[in-house]
Amino acid sequence: LALNSSIDYTRIGADDANSLSGPRYWRNLRFTNNIFEISSKFELILFQISDLGGTGRYRTNMDVFAHAGISFFYHNPKGSKNGYSWVNLRPLKTEGFSYKSIAFATPIGGGINITYNRYTRFGLVLNYRQTFTDYLDDISTVFADPNNLSTEAAELSNQYIGPEESSVNFMPGEKRGNSKNKDVFFTLSLTYSKYFMGRNPRYRTYRYGRNSY
């Protein structure tokens, strides 16, 4: 069992124009969000091969692991009317009230690490984050009354492009998002590590009855 702490940058985004759902396509909203995250995770090795390839030289090792932990992050969703000019959404209060730019998440996932020649490591890591905010995309509850918003906020909050007979579903008080479920996001990362300690004999380890160093 090991403890791993990291600082990560992730950029997420979506566009209703790419949706196959009619109502969501008509909603016509889009966002992008830069997320800066600090996390600590416990890692548990599930499976280990100490001599990958069976060469007998013990130069390449492989670890399969799972992890879980907690993180906090700063995020800043931006919206656009044309997909080119982006505006910070949080200060605009597009649903009529504010939310925090700092939030927490529980990262859960796993991956594979391959260590070559004891000091160089490559990894592939899948990370699922269940957050405690519903505003990564600035969309959570219902459409606000445009009379209670600034002109810019009203324009970005409701960009309906559907048929006229369905416009009633996008009026103030109607569903804009789903506040019952908090936001989640996934990342798939390639990692590289270089060890600068461990050349001292005191760090030697033994596998399969022989000294691997």
Region annotations inferred by a language model:
Residues 1-36, 71-105, 115, 119, ...:
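Primarily recognizes Gram-negative and organellar outer-membrane beta-barrels
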Residues 37, 63:
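Amphipathic alpha-helical recognition patches that constitute DNA-binding helices
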Residues 39-52:
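Internal transmembrane alpha-helix with an interfacial aromatic "cap," most often the third helix
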Residues 40, 66, 108-110, 126, ...:
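Membrane-embedded beta-strands of outer-membrane beta-barrel proteins
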Residues 43-45, 111-113, 193:
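Transmembrane beta-barrel domains of outer membrane proteins
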Residues 50-60:
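Short helix/loop segment immediately N-terminal to the Walker
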Residues 64-71:
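Hydrophobic alpha-helical segments of small multi-pass membrane proteins
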